[in-house]
């Protein structure tokens, strides 16, 4: 299988985001986006997905975190799409259930080529520290649109918002890892009866 790494930079009037990733890494991460709780969540994706992830962002966080969080999702999605290439030889589908104490979340991924998000997380409070939980949906929508993947995110239970979020992001990492894994039985085939994803 080819080298599955990518580097993408996105510059707008609101943000500057640079993402470097390696899908076949060991889970090393350097996340510097100026939004501490989101940095913590992205670190979970790297560690549990065994994705080497380096993200740097400079955004208009003096207004709020919206543009930075959304644009990190967009740029990460672009990097995922670039690293996967034509998707030959991957498993395509991935899923994970992850618990953390009382919280349990399920994430299901399909590198389908069709952006689709089902996000069902009823956070028990509106903020985790200073972080607005509404921004998670913006992140996932940007990721899905630009990675061209179908993503189902469900928090099944939880009474602690931090635990709810952390189980979602750990499960995302594990589901991405499973879906992007090389399948030796498919070798150089695209995992679709259409012959393209």
Swiss-Prot record:
**CDD domains given for it?**
IGPD
- Superkingdom of the source? Bacteria
Q: Which GO terms describe its biological process?
A: L-histidine biosynthetic process
- Which pathway is this protein engaged in? Amino-acid biosynthesis; L-histidine biosynthesis; L-histidine from 5-phospho-alpha-D-ribose 1-diphosphate: step 6/9
In terms of InterPro entries, this protein maps to: IGPD_sf, ImidazoleglycerolP_deHydtase, ImidazoleglycerP_deHydtase_CS, Ribosomal_Su5_D2-typ_SF
**What PANTHER family does the entry give?**
IMIDAZOLEGLYCEROL-PHOSPHATE DEHYDRATASE, IMIDAZOLEGLYCEROL-PHOSPHATE DEHYDRATASE HIS7
Q: What name is this protein filed under?
A: Imidazoleglycerol-phosphate dehydratase
> Which species is the source of this protein?
Alkalilimnicola ehrlichii (strain ATCC BAA-1101 / DSM 17681 / MLHE-1)
Recall the taxonomic lineage recorded for the source organism.
Bacteria, Pseudomonadati, Pseudomonadota, Gammaproteobacteria, Chromatiales
